[in-house]
């Protein structure tokens, strides 16, 4: 007689973390993931705060301006404005000592701006982490997430680091089209931003990337060699086809004839298209960090002194300085009325050209 003894196998219950991990990473129409716990709530709150502010909230108490659709603004002039200078770097929490739980007072004090700025920054970081997470799940390299770090760096440097280096959130850009244009004028007038090499690298990166994208797209279209049956390019090819339908060799020969030099392989070509805009944006973010600390490395004082002493001496730099002084004299009184600024003669617009 044979007796079989079956060992009792104790089934281990999945932990709460495993259950959450399984649910978050489940295959669905919109991937959630752990990064989604940061991305979706923060993006929802940031966008909701912006729509609420531009629709209903005035900037009368912080800037002396109308800034909402309710007051008659349009899409270009509506904005969620920065808090007043008197608030300094307060986080302006709804339950904090400034608003004390009063939502109307919180909006009047610019609380929506800090709300949108902080939730917006965390939403962008969550989106970058989302790209990391999905790339890891499908075994891709993380270059998409690395590339997205560049616009995050620009956002954080302009909206958070720059005002932290100044006297308060007041000096950050407001969240609106005209508000950001005003901030650009402010940057030029008070920091001579267009002469800053870091700004120049940023412009070269963005415009260079646009040029590279245009050249790359046109070259691929020009070297298609397997025409499909569709009426146009968009319907001619199956998006899941395995084979390529354009010729890298033909493209290489074409640009070799145009410039005498061309990319020899796709890896170097696409890395360069990644490198140009990402490096440019990171350099501009570093430049804004310098402005936050009020660095004056690119003020050519010797030319300014000579232009002041010699009526016949003028350079493109001194012409720009003259315009900057006009911007300062015009903006400061409007932009900072609480300071009651009185300008001495030497800082008012002067010079030979105007």
Swiss-Prot record:
A plastoquinone binds at residues 216, 263. Fe cation binds at residues 216, 270. The chain crosses the membrane at residues 42-62, 126-142, 154-167, 209-229, 280-296. Its EC number is 1.10.3.9. It is a multi-pass membrane protein. The keyword Transcription does not apply. The D1/D2 heterodimer binds P680, chlorophylls that are the primary electron donor of PSII, and subsequent electron acceptors. It shares a non-heme iron and each subunit binds pheophytin, quinone, additional chlorophylls, carotenoids and lipids. There is also a Cl(-1) ion associated with D1 and D2, which is required for oxygen evolution. The PSII complex binds additional chlorophylls, carotenoids and specific lipids. This is Photosystem II D2 protein. It comes from Chlorokybus atmophyticus. The lineage of its organism: Eukaryota, Viridiplantae, Streptophyta, Chlorokybophyceae, Chlorokybales.
